[in-house]
Curated annotation (Swiss-Prot):
Temperature dependence: Optimum temperature is 70 degrees Celsius.
PANTHER family per the UniProt record, alphabetical: CHROMATE REDUCTASE (PTHR30543), NAD(P)H-DEPENDENT FMN REDUCTASE LOT6 (PTHR30543:SF21)
Enzyme class: oxidoreductase
Expression induction or repression: Constitutively expressed.
InterPro entries the UniProt entry points to: Flavoprotein-like_sf, FMN_Rdtase-like_dom, NAD(P)H-dep_reductase
Annotated protein name in UniProt: NADPH azoreductase
Keyword check for Cell membrane: no
Length: 178
């Protein structure tokens, strides 16, 4: 089964990127890295569909059996970079596809608001966010390294995502939409 991990931070050395890379490496996922990809600000113009970064994003998500969205929390919401990437996607990429949500919060404040903003945006594209979600604080990622205490939290959410990926594979089979 194909797993796609979207790093929602525009920072090349951000904590969220450390987490996203860990997930992609540990679980043989494909990383779409918003710190590297040159995804322009979404404007709704038809011409944006032909951009390579947009085609790559849409193709990866559509081909995935499951998606992990990782974001920092900026001003009580997901990053603008992640929201921008979601604006390029639609229900045709997310149909019958489970999505795991993970937020990396800094400064000891929350992360839950980033998750809530992801839920709201995902509802608009009929994405199926799984019940389990993770908030990691700044203590979980320090000096570019993922702390050992964060790894079980990540493994648990990916384990649940993979279970949902199996279920949705069967659902698609029964619906004849594979």
């Amino acid at each position: 089964m194909k797993l796609v991990v979207i790093n929602g931070t525009p920072r090349k050395f951000g904590r969220t990127r450390v987490v996203a890379k860990y997930i992609a490496d540990q679980f043989e996922g494909e990383l779409y890295d918003l710190a590297i990809e040159e995804l322009p600000l979404y404007n709704g113009e038809e011409s944006q569909r032909d951009l390579e970064a947009v085609k790559k994003l849409k193709t990866l998500v559509k081909a995935a059996d499951g998606v992990v969205l990782c974001t920092p929390e900026y001003h009580n919401a997901m990053s603008g970079a992640l929201k921008n990437s979601l604006d390029y996607l639609s229900s045709s990429e997310f149909i019958h596809k489970p999505v795991a949500l993970l937020a990396v919060a800094g400064g000891g404040k929350g992360g839950i608001n980033a998750l809530n903003s992801m839920h709201a945006s995902l509802a608009g594209v009929y994405a199926n966010a799984i019940p389990k979600q993770v908030v990691l604080d700044g203590l979980h990622v320090q000096d570019g390294e993922l702390g050992e205490d964060a790894k079980p939290l990540i493994h648990d959410v990916v384990k649940e995502l993979k279970a949902y990926m199996s279920v949705y594979k069967e659902v698609k089979k029964q619906l004849g939409v594979e």
